[in-house]
Design a protein with these regions (language model features):
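Non-catalytic pre-domain segments flanking phosphatase-related domains
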Residues: 1-15
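Flexible, charged surface loops at secondary-structure boundaries
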Residues: 6-8, 43, 104, 151-153
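Asp-based phosphoryl-transfer active-site loop
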Residues: 11-27
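A short, hydrophobic secondary-structure junction motif
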Residues: 18, 49-51, 147-148
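Short gly/ser/thr-rich secondary-structure transition/capping motifs
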Residues: 30-31, 141
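Active-site phosphate-binding/coordination module
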Residues: 32-130
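Hydrophobic, aromatic-enriched interface-forming segments
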Residues: 119, 140-154
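Acidic, His- and aromatic-enriched active-site or binding-groove loops in soluble protein domains
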Residues: 128-146
Length: 154
């Protein structure tokens, strides 16, 4: 991605979602028309990317419906350019196992993000329902029954 973009002499521009393009706290639930117009103009000379701590399946339709050139998700652990994965750094199985043990010991919800879903450990806890509602986490992306030894998360 970077090589192709630099070869073309175009510097990519990165945008966050929460509090930047959208702000649910103040009622901005979609990309504002003025912002879309600015993005359209920007994309004439620079690729526009989303850069988010969210995984792609957790990015709301209001963002996905705009033709961004790429996505840097999971805080940089998964990168797409023009719909293709160009980089991913999976969390080790050992780290996943340890995180699950810590969540068990604390009685806490744990979110493990993959590209296509979010594995939720202890989804029955009230804090998950509160988090899911606040951040518009759709049920169809949540997986609660999983084998930690077989998942790839970032």
């Amino acid at each position: 991605m970077c090589i192709e973009v630099i070869r073309l002499g175009k510097q990519p521009v990165f945008f966050d979602i929460d509090g930047t393009l959208l702000d649910y706290q103040i009622g901005i639930n979609d990309i504002l028309p003025s912002c879309q117009h600015s993005l359209d103009r920007l994309r004439q000379s620079h690729p526009a990317f989303i850069a988010s701590g969210r995984t792609k399946c957790f990015i709301v339709d209001e963002i996905l419906n705009y033709p961004f050139d790429g996505f840097v998700t999971c805080n940089g652990a998964y990168v797409e350019y023009k719909g293709q994965c160009i980089y991913k750094k999976a969390i080790s199985k050992t780290a996943i196992s340890h995180a699950l043990q810590v969540a068990d010991a604390l009685g806490a919800v744990l979110y493990l993000e993959s590209h296509d879903c979010i594995y939720v450990h202890h989804a029955h806890l009230p804090s998950h329902a509160i988090f899911a509602e606040k951040w518009r986490m759709h049920d169809h992306i949540v997986v609660t029954d999983f084998d930690p030894a077989t998942i790839e998360v970032y």
